[in-house]
Amino acid sequence: LEKTNAWLTQFGDKIGGIWAANDGMGLAAIEALRADGRAGKVPVTGIDGIKLAVEAIQKGEMAGTVAWDPFWQGGMGLAIAFDAKTGVFDPAKEPKEHREFYGTGVIITGDNAQAYYDSNIKSEPTLHWKDIWGRVSGQIQYN
């Protein structure tokens, strides 16, 4: 909030958009923009896909956010441990892409905010733990 207020004072109409490292910061920026009469006029994006951010997107005050899907992240940890413990697979024999991998995030904008809200906030998402690698988007690469 304080940073955005300072930027609005210093840069005024030169601010064409605000990227925030998380939704909480993005929402604070929106609060400052509201006080300046510019909420919804300056695009603000965040990361996390929290309820208040999705609601701000629905109101047109926030341009977007990325949800990293905490249900899936937590579930993956449990599903992998469960499958290893019950003998579904042997982690020592799994390829490297099943040890260090990226998950697929969800980009939330005005186009899909209501659908995301309905399926991930208003209710719990449907996840398929029989296919634990189905949402993996690739192996982490190191240079």
Residues covered by each model-derived region:
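A residue-level marker of the well-folded mature domains of exported/periplasmic proteins
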Residues: 1-143
